[in-house]
C-alpha cells in the first residue's frame, strides 16, 4: 500500500512539474553572411561556437538553413534562464580568449557575417513544452503572425482550442510556440512546425484550409473582426549539429 501511494505521489508530482510554465528567455538569431562565407560560418559554429556558448550558460536549441537561401542566412535559437543571464553570458562570451582566437582564425581570409537580426521571445502556453520532431530528415517551418491591434489574445485562444489539434490532424507536427518581445507595439506569434518535406507541407496546408472544422473555428473566432494581419513563413532544414532534427 505504501509503495502504491508513493507511486501515485510521484505521478502527481511529475504531472504538476510537467505543467509548470517555461520561463526561459529565448532568442532567435539570423546571421546573413557575405557571399561565399556561409560554409565558414557553419564550420565555426559546429567546431567551436556552440561549445563556447554552452560554456557560458547559453542553451543551443536548434540550427537551420533556409531551403531557399538567397540571402546566405543561418537561423538559430538560444535559451537563457532570463534576460539578465543573457546579458552576462554574451558579455562573457565576447571577452572569452578562446572565442577571440577562433573568430580571428576563421576571419583570416575575410569577414564572415554581414548582418545579424535578433528576435527575443517568451514561450507561449499554446504548447505545454517545446518538442523535438519525431521523424528524421524533417523540414521545419518557421511562421510569424502579426495580428491586428489587440487581437493576439484571440489568436492564442484559437490556437489552444482548435488550430493545434487541426494541424496534427493534417500531419503537421507542433514543435514550439513563442510570443515575441517588442520594444513598441503588440507581440507577434512565432512558431515552428515540422513536416516530412516541403511537398508534404503543401498538401497538409491545402487540406487544413478546406477542413470544415477549421473553417467553422476560424469564422466563429472572427465574428467580431479579423485577427491576423500578416503571415510570414520560412522553410528550414536543420544542420547536422542541431539538437532539433
Explain the meaning of each model-derived region.
Residues 1-22:
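Bacterial Sec-dependent N-terminal signal peptides
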Residues 18-216, 220-245:
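Short S/T/G/P-rich N-terminal loop/turn motif that feeds into the first structured element of a domain
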Amino acid at each position: 500500500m505504501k509503495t502504491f501511494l508513493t507511486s501515485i505521489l510521484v505521478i502527481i508530482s511529475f504531472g504538476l512539474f510537467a505543467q509548470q510554465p517555461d520561463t526561459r528567455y529565448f532568442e532567435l538569431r539570423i546571421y546573413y553572411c557575405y557571399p561565399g562565407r556561409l560554409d565558414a560560418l557553419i564550420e565555426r559554429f559546429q567546431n567551436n561556437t556552440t561549445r563556447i556558448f554552452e560554456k557560458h550558460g547559453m542553451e543551443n536549441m536548434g540550427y537551420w538553413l533556409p531551403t531557399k537561401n538567397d540571402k546566405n542566412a543561418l537561423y538559430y535559437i538560444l535559451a537563457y534562464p532570463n534576460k539578465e543571464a543573457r546579458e552576462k553570458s554574451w558579455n562573457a562570451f565576447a571577452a572569452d580568449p578562446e572565442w577571440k582566437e577562433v573568430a580571428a582564425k576563421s576571419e583570416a581570409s575575410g569577414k564572415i557575417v554581414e548582418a545579424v537580426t535578433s528576435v527575443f521571445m517568451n514561450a507561449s502556453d499554446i504548447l505545454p513544452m517545446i518538442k523535438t520532431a519525431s521523424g528524421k530528415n524533417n523540414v521545419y517551418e518557421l511562421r510569424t503572425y502579426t495580428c491586428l491591434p489587440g487581437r493576439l489574445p484571440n489568436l492564442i485562444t484559437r490556437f489552444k482550442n482548435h488550430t493545434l489539434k487541426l494541424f496534427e490532424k493534417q500531419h503537421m507536427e507542433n514543435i514550439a510556440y513563442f510570443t515575441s518581445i517588442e520594444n513598441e507595439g503588440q507581440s507577434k506569434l512565432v512558431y515552428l512546425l515540422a513536416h516530412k518535406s516541403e511537398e508534404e507541407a503543401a498538401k497538409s496546408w491545402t487540406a487544413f484550409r478546406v477542413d470544415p472544422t477549421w473553417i467553422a473555428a476560424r469564422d466563429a473566432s472572427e465574428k467580431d473582426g479579423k485577427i491576423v494581419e500578416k503571415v510570414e513563413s520560412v522553410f528550414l532544414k536543420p544542420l547536422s549539429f542541431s539538437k532539433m532534427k
